[in-house]
């Protein structure tokens, strides 16, 4: 049984690796300093919807979970998101403001259809009938973040004039915290998995696709990854 489960986790990780955000053209351009300030601003404002929604994803799973140990792990992640000042939403705002976006601009921003679709995908799986699939949706995202955060910091400091660590503290925080979150989420999938392995893999496929679709929205149609890549 353990070997079968490990093969299942390998399948999950393969789905994520085959559509890793760090390989997306938008993040490749970020790492090379090839994005414009306007592209970074548009991205930062549009990503805000997901940042605000992330604690709700966790709450949706936590509130319906009967396993005490699983709830503790979910609550630990949720507390990381919302506790203290600055919390993760505050840290994201610091990044956005460092790009020259005003608080009024950020709050008045109308999220794109791609941003709404991404959040809707996460929420659908996190509120669905499979708790393991909901956690898999989170794992498919958070397991990628440490590498991405490290590369974002490098790009921001080398090419985009970021010298104050507070301006990219959101990424510094997630470079470390999401290593633990991903490890805990992998354990949670094992704890919560029933006969819903297919849903777990489906959740990962849909989430990784929605993440790519969101990043595509900041590129010219001819360079978007979803237009000419298949996995």
UniProtKB/Swiss-Prot annotation:
Effect of residue 27 to F: Loss of PABA synthase activity
Pfam families: TENA_THI-4 (PF03070)
Binding site for Fe(2+) 2: 81, 142, 178, 181
GO terms classed as biological process: small molecule metabolic process; sulfur compound metabolic process; symbiont-mediated suppression of host tumor necrosis factor-mediated signaling pathway
Molecular function GO labels: metal ion binding; oxidoreductase activity; toxin activity
Outcome after substituting residue 174 to A: Apoptotic activity is decreased by more than 60%, but the mutant still binds to death receptors
Regulation: The protein is a cosubstrate rather than a true enzyme and is left in an inactive state after a single turnover. Inactive under anaerobic conditions.
Any single GO CC term annotated in Swiss-Prot or TrEMBL for this entry: extracellular region
Domain of life: Bacteria
SUPFAM superfamilies: Heme oxygenase-like
Main location: secreted
Cofactor or coenzyme needed: Fe(2+); Mn(2+)
Site (Side-chain cleavage): 27
Binding positions for Fe(2+) 1 per the UniProt entry: 81, 88, 174
Subcellular location: Secreted; Host cytoplasm
Keywords: Host cytoplasm, Iron, Metal-binding, Oxidoreductase, Secreted, Toxin, Virulence
Annotated cofactor note: Binds 2 divalent metal cations per subunit. Can use a diiron cofactor for catalysis. However, activity is much higher in vitro in the presence of both iron and manganese, which implicates a heterodinuclear iron/manganese cofactor.
Stated family: Belongs to the CADD family.
Subunit (UniProt): Homodimer. During infection, interacts with death domains of mammalian tumor necrosis factor (TNF) family receptors Fas, DR4, DR5 and to some extent TNFR1, but not with the respective downstream adapters.
Note: Can complement the PABA-auxotrophic E.coli mutant lacking pabA, pabB and pabC genes.
Name of protein: 4-aminobenzoate synthase
Species whose genome carries this gene: Chlamydia trachomatis serovar D (strain ATCC VR-885 / DSM 19411 / UW-3/Cx)
């Amino acid at each position: 049984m353990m070997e079968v489960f490990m093969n299942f986790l390998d399948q999950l990780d393969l789905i994520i690796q085959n559509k890793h955000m760090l390989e997306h053209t938008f993040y490749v351009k970020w790492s090379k300093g090839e994005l414009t300030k306007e592209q970074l601003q548009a991205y930062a404002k549009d990503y805000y919807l997901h940042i605000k929604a992330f604690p709700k994803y966790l709450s949706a799973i936590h509130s319906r979970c009967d396993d005490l140990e699983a709830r503790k792990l979910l609550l630990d992640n949720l507390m990381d998101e919302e506790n203290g000042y600055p919390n993760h939403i505050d840290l994201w705002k610091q990044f956005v403001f460092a790009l020259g976006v005003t608080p009024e601009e950020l709050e008045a921003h109308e999220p794109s259809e791609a941003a709404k679709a991404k959040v809707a995908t996460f929420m659908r799986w996190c509120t669905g009938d499979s708790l393991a699939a909901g956690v898999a949706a989170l794992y498919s995202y958070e397991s990628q973040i440490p590498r991405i955060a490290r590369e974002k910091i490098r790009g921001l400091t080398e090419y985009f004039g970021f010298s104050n660590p507070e301006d990219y503290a959101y990424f510094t925080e997630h470079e470390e915290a999401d290593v633990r979150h991903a490890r805990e989420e992998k354990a949670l999938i094992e704890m919560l998995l029933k006969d819903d392995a297919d849903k777990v893999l489906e959740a990962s496929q849909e989430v990784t696709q929605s993440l790519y679709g969101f990043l595509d929205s900041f590129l010219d149609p001819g360079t978007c990854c979803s237009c000419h890549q298949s996995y």
